[in-house]
Amino acid sequence: MSDDGSIRPIEILLIEDDPGDVLLTTEAFQSSKITNVLRVVSDGADAIDHLRAQADAGTVPDLVLLDLNLPKVSGPEILEFIKTDPRLRRVPVVVLTTSAADEDIVRTYDRHANAYVTKPVDVDRFLDVVRQIDHFYLTVVQLPRSGDAAAGF
């Protein structure tokens, strides 16, 4: 809830450099039954700057969707940044990437990713996967409130 008692929208940060995947992910979250705000950052350096600024302001995202293959700073480096910053470490991070390589999967779970999902090639299947992430993280699980995660409780 927000300070005025109203339910605040769920804030999702999508870190993705492929415009087609951004469009499909946006479409899937727009059809969500839960009010959400989807912010998009398209390179790793901007993602770290954005996350740092949000943490400084005490308004961290409720969920991060992270591609591994990004320009400037890689997805695994961003994941490590998130999980080692006490203000961000409780934010769930779902890796959503084209790689199905075992070493990528192990490397991201070693860095404490909350889930690893290989992007389907089929558009309808991709939309379905994003909707399942939406359903699970926005309606099934309880997420720490943005302020609690940033405060490091």
Label every PLM stretch briefly.
Residues 71, 87, 99-103:
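Negatively charged, flexible loop motifs adjacent to catalytic sites
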Residues 42, 70-73, 82:
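Hydrophobic residue at a beta-alpha junction
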Residues 54-59, 83-90, 111:
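Conserved phosphotransfer cores of two-component systems
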